[in-house]
Amino acid sequence: MNRCSKFIIFTLTVAGGFCFSTSAASVTNLFGFSGKEIYPIDQQISNLHVADLDGDGLNDLIVVNNLRSKINLLYNLTGKTNRTDTATTKKLELNDLPPGSRFRIDSLPTEQRVAALIVADVNGDGRPDLVYFGDAKDLTVRYNLGTNGWSEPKTWHLDSGRLDPNALAVGDLNGDGLNDIALLGDNGAVHFLAQQKDHTLAEPVKISYSGTPKAIQITDIDGDGKNDLVFVDFDSPTPLRVRLQIAGGQLGPEIYFKTQPIRSFWLDTLAGGTTNFLVDIVTATGRAEVSQFTRQPAEPLAGKFKQGQLQILPLNKSTAGTRGVLWADVNGDGRADLIVAEPESGQLSVYLQQADGTLASAKKFPCLAGVSQIAVADWNHDGHPEIFLLSRDENAVAVTQFDKNGRLPFPTPLPLDGKPIALAVGALKPGAKPTLAIIVDVDGVRSLVTRTADGKTTTQKLSDSFKSNPTTLVIQDVNQDGLADLVVLIPYEKIKVLLQKKDGKFEEVDVDPPGGVMEQPWLAAADVVGDGKTELLLPQKNFVRAVVLEPAAKIPGATNAPAWKFTVKDQINGSASDSRIVGAATVVNGTNTVPSLFLFDAEHKQLTLCERDAAGVWQVVKNLDLPVTTFSAIQSVSLGGAAVAFTGQNSVAWLPLGGNVWKLTRLDDYDTLIKNGYLNDVVAGDLTGGGRKQLVFMETGKNYLDLVQFSAAGKLVPGDRWQVFEQHTFRNSQNGLPEPRECAIADVTGDKKNDLIVLVHDRILVYPQE
């Protein structure tokens, strides 16, 4: 065994030291490294961390040792004169540290294979604790008791936790100055454990996310002194998503940043200030890039429109077939708010719009379970809107409104004979108070029930052939006679129109939609011909048609009343023949008489802006790429200015048509000078003592460390590089892992100069800085 250990040490020994000159970056500092120190531990050690565990002013090393089901703690003994390990008669086992080593190795047992480890103070006592998560799905905290003592494990079982070193993060995420814990889950949410004022950890709560991120990080992206939550999906064309921390310690919506797919990343204040930079390695090219987060005015779009910041708000995941989601003013302040049903928990989440156009954090109120539809209107014109909720689970329609204390009381069910299947609310005649319209089912017989705020109710039986369940009920004057009608959308069926007659009753007609029936029907309304009247917008795959319901030509000699048909007034095409338009919204652009039209193209993941040209023909003006398309509808909404809002089952989003935007601005890139080299990972740290940080790339094709300077001009300047080992000389090196696989930059020699600590094969290498 001793011979094998010596052989391994010999083949890894590099004669002499290394010197790195940063003169090319106009920096005069020189730094170099003496020959490396080698500390064998075990195969497959991982999760390298550096921290002063025992408070002696010296940095210690921590690694996960899953082969032995333990976490190894390497206590730093540099300069200590009271050591007890300098002489021993004990025979050294393989990978034992010899007497006189810089580190004394200790360990803590684990009851699981640890996937992620963070070393940080999570109880406010100033001592770094151990936070880890593994295959037993237990988030575990071992508190540092000082004097090399550790608490018993405190665990939280989290079945959906992701088994990945990048899935765990620690930092102050709610602005109270205390470190919190975040664990990325595979179920659409982050498990968040806030540190409380008594320094205990609260029970986990979920922070929803969109997409399928593989990593999280807590860091200050925008330099405002507050930590933000970063999501990374390496293989996505928008790998980086950020939720900025806003007032009150809340997290804002997600902002997506577009780059190429990446294999690794590093976020750091490379210039020594508060500005965070992103260093990433592009998957396709292996080229390293450095970018900066910048705030810029939105680019012009068309007319008064500018392309603002698309913001995505993930909702609590729901597996219900449908859930109620609506943009509407619910507190009477004239601003559109967001109301979201939580079908499984029987709650209503309300996001009130603030004066600056942002949404406050959600307030939850109890309501009916299984709410699938929501409607809002000031039913009695008292200035306080009512919220109407339809629950098929409870076979009820109920109403509630905010009280003077800002509370939403439990909804009051409305008297109803039968099962409600669709509802809408709005004025049926010009100037009238809103009427609640409900389609109900009583033992297979469908009826229309209308109810006003004073309790007046009417019921009208509908056709016996009406058996299918509608997805949408809309109040809209489809024949432009000044009386509001009811439009019922049913998958794979004709459009059912309840035409209002002068006596207030409704004529039930079924009309073929232009282009045929649809699997997922939808509609919108807009004046697209400029005559001051609103047309119905109906989709036909790659275009929408503006239609008006008109009587069909009467057949000569026929005695029946003429049938009804949709007459096409105009057509607006998407950007391509294979476009799939699933939503449309109109927004007034400056002083234009006819509003602009936005089409949601799900096939191309685009929002298409269309406008009428001088000849009155609709043209595509601009296609805006969307990082997320899991939405089912769009509409115009005012959020401190004009915006297009998106709604979906588990997320909503909005695109302001103005304002400033965050962008990821690329500063420079770097191709390794190592022939056929493969940059796999990167870390950063200050190796000169000047405040600016250098980059250390782990090159795993030829097993090099590749050092690069980040210059004051924002450029990546090549420095020194050396081979950590030669693959063919290393015994048992075929472990399938990239080498060198982890690296840290910290002072472990006690001379106030940062050293290089590298994890390779079964050992830790330390390159002391000269």
State where each predicted segment sits.
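Bacterial N-terminal signal peptides
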Residues: 8-19
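Positively charged n-region of N-terminal signal peptides that target proteins for export
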Residues: 1-6
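Beta-propeller-forming repeat regions
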Residues: 20-770
